[in-house]
UniProtKB/Swiss-Prot annotation:
<keyword id="KW-0489">Methyltransferase</keyword>
<dbReference type="InterPro" id="IPR000878">
    <property type="entry name" value="4pyrrol_Mease"/>
</dbReference>
<keyword id="KW-0597">Phosphoprotein</keyword>
<feature type="binding site">
    <location>
        <begin position="22"/>
        <end position="23"/>
    </location>
    <ligand>
        <name>NAD(+)</name>
    </ligand>
</feature>
<dbReference type="InterPro" id="IPR006366">
    <property type="entry name" value="CobA/CysG_C"/>
</dbReference>
<feature type="region of interest" description="Uroporphyrinogen-III C-methyltransferase">
    <location>
        <begin position="215"/>
        <end position="472"/>
    </location>
</feature>
<feature type="binding site">
    <location>
        <begin position="330"/>
        <end position="331"/>
    </location>
    <ligand>
        <name>S-adenosyl-L-methionine</name>
    </ligand>
</feature>
<dbReference type="InterPro" id="IPR012409">
    <property type="entry name" value="Sirohaem_synth"/>
</dbReference>
<keyword id="KW-0456">Lyase</keyword>
<dbReference type="Pfam" id="PF10414">
    <property type="entry name" value="CysG_dimeriser"/>
</dbReference>
<keyword id="KW-0560">Oxidoreductase</keyword>
<dbReference type="InterPro" id="IPR006367">
    <property type="entry name" value="Sirohaem_synthase_N"/>
</dbReference>
<comment type="similarity">
    <text>In the N-terminal section; belongs to the precorrin-2 dehydrogenase / sirohydrochlorin ferrochelatase family.</text>
</comment>
<feature type="binding site">
    <location>
        <begin position="43"/>
        <end position="44"/>
    </location>
    <ligand>
        <name>NAD(+)</name>
    </ligand>
</feature>
<feature type="region of interest" description="Precorrin-2 dehydrogenase /sirohydrochlorin ferrochelatase">
    <location>
        <begin position="1"/>
        <end position="203"/>
    </location>
</feature>
<dbReference type="InterPro" id="IPR035996">
    <property type="entry name" value="4pyrrol_Methylase_sf"/>
</dbReference>
<feature type="active site" description="Proton acceptor">
    <location>
        <position position="247"/>
    </location>
</feature>
Length: 472
């Protein structure tokens, strides 16, 4: 270990900064967050530091550095581009046994700044001992993505409750088990949803021995396929799951991000071939949550856009099970973006309509007259089976048979395939497309040939036969 990690209490302690430029300003901002009393030695200040001085946030010594300025200073930072001055600052500090840091000059540092993940009062520091600062920054970014922002609330509440927990539980082992349960159970879940009062009530119930073994359900949108489109919140919830119920539309890459020891249950549905009935899925969500498990219902795209997520949550809510919803990138947004097809465009479409090709058996017919109007984009989910009927109805109600269309198969995935043609060719295109597929109808499809960016560049469209663009 080249450096001993320490956390210093700088509240109201004097810290000297030598230098008044941008580098000094960055260090000063960090010191402000720690509550330090900042003194700056510099002949001139940057405009940012000048404003801080006018606001009374820093003290300014408009003079050259002198060793006696280190008297009664807790630590010093040299942030100048003068190597001779920096060395003099370090030597004077070292002689007085004062911690010193010379920015970007590790040999002249008795302490170094780590990369920081700030969830105060919880703080994570990462250091490469000055050997690979970029690597430390990359690790910090990964931790930022994994650690929920609400950890600060969790740590603050835990701090307020430490005394009460200690009064109720004399044994250190008992207290440890209490907090382990709290930080991985319903208390943590309530914090993540911003329900802080309810979270403290949960702690009180646990202390009084009235805790109920009740789990929760998280309805999570997995996005259209590319694991990079999974939301940060979705990843965090998946990493906390005890059991995951997922559909066929969820890509293997997204499933790989589920907590390793979580149970995985496929309740996938395909048009006309449901492996698990919807009623059975609804009941399974309730049963698992009533067993005290954290259940993630993982759905492709966004769970509230043609995903029957609302129906499932109605059952969960009626059973009194706590739940939360994590939105996802819906297929119409993700697949079209990866295909270079904007859903709206000032010159081509002022509106977009999302349609499902599978309605309830007793559902009313679509308003084809409205859907056939020009200057709009239609994005049709699960429409390949009914592509012929869709094409016929739109043409019959006035939409031109030469209207550009795209069928995007396995959108956003490495084997994405985009088929371009006209409304008259929609049935043929749909028959060729791999599933799952999205139908896009409207003049915006023509922009595909200009702004497609994912995978191979599009082939030239044929006016006679559909063009197939394999973006693998």
């Amino acid at each position: 270990m080249d450096y001993l990690p320490l956390f210093a209490d700088l509240k109201q302690r004097p810290v000297l900064i030598v230098g008044g430029g941008e580098v000094a300003a960055r260090k000063i901002e960090l010191l402000h967050r720690a509550g330090a009393q900042v003194w700056v030695v510099a002949q001139t200040l940057s405009s940012e530091l000048e404003q801080q001085y006018q606001d009374g946030r820093i003290h300014w010594l408009a003079q050259d550095f002198l060793p006696e300025q280190l008297d009664n200073v807790f630590l010093v930072i040299a942030a100048t581009n003068d190597t001779v001055l920096n060395a003099a600052v370090f030597a004077a500090a070292d002689q007085r046994c004062i911690l010193a840091n010379v920015v970007d000059d590790q040999p002249l540092c008795s302490f170094i700044f780590p990369s920081i993940v700030d969830r105060s009062p919880l703080v994570v520091a990462i250091s490469s001992s000055g050997q690979a600062p970029v690597l430390a920054r990359i690790l910090r970014e990964k931790l930022e993505a994994l650690l929920p922002t609400r950890l600060s609330d969790m740590a603050a509440i835990a701090g307020r409750w430490r005394g009460r927990v200690k009064q109720h539980m004399a044994s250190m082992g008992e207290r440890r088990r209490f907090w382990e349960h709290a930080f991985s159970g319903r208390f943590a879940s309530l914090i993540s949803r911003g329900q802080l009062t309810e979270a403290e009530n949960e702690l009180q119930l646990s202390l009084e021995g009235q805790h109920r073994a009740l789990g929760e359900v998280a309805l999570v949108g997995a996005g259209p396929g590319d694991a990079g489109l999974l939301t940060l919140r979705g990843l965090q919830v998946m990493q906390q799951a005890d059991v995951v119920l997922y559909d066929h539309l969820v890509s293997p890459e997204v499933l790989d991000l589920v907590r390793r020891d979580a149970e995985r249950i496929c309740v996938g549905k395909r048009a006309g071939a449901h492996s698990v009935t919807q009623e059975a899925t609804n009941q399974l969500l309730v049963t698992l949550a009533q067993q005290g498990k954290r259940v993630v219902r993982l759905k492709g795209g966004d769970p509230f856009i043609f995903g029957r997520g609302g129906e499932e949550l109605q059952v969960v809510a009626q059973a009194g099970i706590p739940f939360q919803v994590v939105p996802g990138v819906t297929a119409a947004a993700g697949a079209t973006a990866y295909a270079g097809i904007p859903l709206t465009h000032r010159d081509h479409a002022q509106s977009v309509t999302f349609i499902t090709g599978h309605c309830r058996p007793d559902g009313d017919d679509l308003d084809w007259q409205t859907l056939a109007r020009g200057r709009q984009t239609l994005a049709i989910y699960m429409g390949t089976v009914k592509a012929a009927a869709i094409s016929q109805q739109l043409i019959a109600h006035g939409r031109s048979s030469t209207t550009p269309v795209a069928v995007i198969g396995r959108g956003t995935r490495v084997d994405q395939q985009v088929l371009i043609g006209t409304l008259a060719q929609l049935e043929s295109l749909a028959q060729q497309a791999p599933t799952p597929a999205l139908l896009v109808i409207g003049e915006v499809v023509n922009l595909h040939h200009q702004i497609a960016w994912f995978g191979q560049q599009p082939q030239t469209e044929s006016a006679i036969s559909p063009s197939v663009v394999n973006l693998a």
